[in-house]
UniProtKB/Swiss-Prot annotation:
<dbReference type="GO" id="GO:0032588">
    <property type="term" value="C:trans-Golgi network membrane"/>
</dbReference>
<dbReference type="InterPro" id="IPR050209">
    <property type="entry name" value="Rab_GTPases_membrane_traffic"/>
</dbReference>
<keyword id="KW-0007">Acetylation</keyword>
<feature type="lipid moiety-binding region" description="S-geranylgeranyl cysteine">
    <location>
        <position position="221"/>
    </location>
</feature>
<comment type="similarity">
    <text>Belongs to the small GTPase superfamily. Rab family.</text>
</comment>
<feature type="modified residue" description="N-acetylalanine">
    <location>
        <position position="2"/>
    </location>
</feature>
<dbReference type="InterPro" id="IPR027417">
    <property type="entry name" value="P-loop_NTPase"/>
</dbReference>
<dbReference type="GO" id="GO:0019900">
    <property type="term" value="F:kinase binding"/>
</dbReference>
<dbReference type="GO" id="GO:0015031">
    <property type="term" value="P:protein transport"/>
</dbReference>
<dbReference type="GO" id="GO:0032456">
    <property type="term" value="P:endocytic recycling"/>
</dbReference>
<feature type="binding site">
    <location>
        <begin position="160"/>
        <end position="161"/>
    </location>
    <ligand>
        <name>GTP</name>
    </ligand>
</feature>
<dbReference type="GO" id="GO:0005525">
    <property type="term" value="F:GTP binding"/>
</dbReference>
<comment type="function">
    <text>Regulator of membrane trafficking. May be required for secretion of cell wall components in cells.</text>
</comment>
<dbReference type="GO" id="GO:0031901">
    <property type="term" value="C:early endosome membrane"/>
</dbReference>
<feature type="lipid moiety-binding region" description="S-geranylgeranyl cysteine">
    <location>
        <position position="220"/>
    </location>
</feature>
<dbReference type="GO" id="GO:0042546">
    <property type="term" value="P:cell wall biogenesis"/>
</dbReference>
<feature type="binding site">
    <location>
        <begin position="72"/>
        <end position="76"/>
    </location>
    <ligand>
        <name>GTP</name>
    </ligand>
</feature>
């Protein structure tokens, strides 16, 4: 399980650094989710992100120190200018839509297609329906998102960056699944140490197929 970690760049020994990318339409709350997770902050006057931005936070998972390096699209999505370099090296992704704006959910398949075209094929992905605090303005039923997540093999949660609902849970879920996948790949490599082409002894940050929790059993945890 993931434990609490330090906000910002914690010092000390780090066992793994995992790059995670946030993708989705503008104004769905990606930067707010990042600020809430990395610094436990929320600004009502948040402006669109300009320029490349990433923040870090160190977590403890299974007695290992894991540094989450979370990248924001920096507003490039408005110009469809997100490049392959943004996805390079990512082992996890948060696919974010605004549950009060149906079109942001309808654009998710396009974002997923782009992600899968540029990222490692085994990247761990969680679908996030943000702004769950605006339930009276909901335009995307939970069941629609659940069905899509199950079909595509994604994890799924609804969050609110405003009141912090499920923000910690969503990042912890993603980081734990990445760690489990990497750990299984390392064990498999060590078991294959007699193979001259083995990668035993190296830390592998790209997820393998592993035995991940099936999406159908991992999409039940939405905000209350």
């Amino acid at each position: 399980m993931a434990g609490g970690g330090g906000y910002g760049g914690a010092s000390g020994k780090v066992d793994y650094v995992f790059k995670v990318v946030l993708i989705g339409d503008s104004a769905v709350g990606k930067s707010q989710l990042l600020a809430r997770f990395a610094r436990d902050e929320f600004s009502m006057d948040s402006k669109a992100t300009i320029g490349v931005e990433f923040q870090t936070r160190t977590l403890s998972i299974e007695q290992k120190s894991i540094k989450a390096q979370i990248w924001d699209t920096a507003g490039q999505e408005r110009y469809r200018a997100v490049t392959s370099a943004y996805y390079r090296g990512a082992v996890g992704a948060m696919l974010v839509y605004d549950m009060t704006k149906r079109e942001t959910f309808e654009h998710i398949p396009r974002w997923l297609e782009e992600l899968r075209a540029h990222a490692d094929k085994n990247i761990v992905i969680i679908l996030i329906g943000n702004k769950s605090d605006l339930e009276d303005q909901r335009a995307v039923p939970t069941e629609d998102a659940k069905e899509f997540a199950e079909k595509e093999g994604l994890f799924f949660l609804e969050t609110s960056a405003l009141n912090a609902t499920n923000v910690e849970n969503s990042f912890n879920t993603l980081m734990t699944q990445i760690y489990n996948t990497v750990n299984k790949k390392n064990l498999a490599s060590e078991g294959d140490s007699n193979n001259p082409g083995s990668l035993a002894g190296k830390k592998i940050l790209i997820p393998g197929s592993g035995q991940e929790i099936p999406a159908k059993t991992s999409t039940c945890c939405t905000s209350s």
